[in-house]
Amino acid sequence: MKQPEQLDARSCVLLRLGERRFALAAEHIAELVAPSRVYRFAHRTPEIDGVILRRGRVVPVCDVAEKLTGKKLTYRRFYLVATRRREGNTDWVALPVSGECELITADLTPAGESDSPHVAAWLSHDGEVIEVLNLDALTPGAKLAQPGMPEAHA
């Protein structure tokens, strides 16, 4: 059996969603902010709870806890604002977290073929094996129009 190769040590941010901890690569973190007003409006993207205004940007709030733990967060302590690359552009997404966040340096083990698409890698910290998240697989992006769906034209 082939052993997965170890990557170099990388900085990651540990975040708590309910009872579980997950990680994001530190280079994807823009900032950690206190909960603020979430603006809700009619839309067709169930993964988006609403938006927050941050540094002159409209940032979608995506509660990924339900996908990862099976439960929506009932308590939001912070929003972890992260960056992601979509279609050549960098945009922000706010992830509600229920506990403290911690910056660590850890050796990452690449995700295997049998791992879920939301797992970018694995790390070990304080005796716990933690999933390093792939935001592109967890958060909604621009989707092509469905056949039969109306499209807006200028």
Regions picked out by a protein language model, each given a short descriptive name:
Residues M1-A154:
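An acidic, low-aromatic, low-complexity terminal/linker signal
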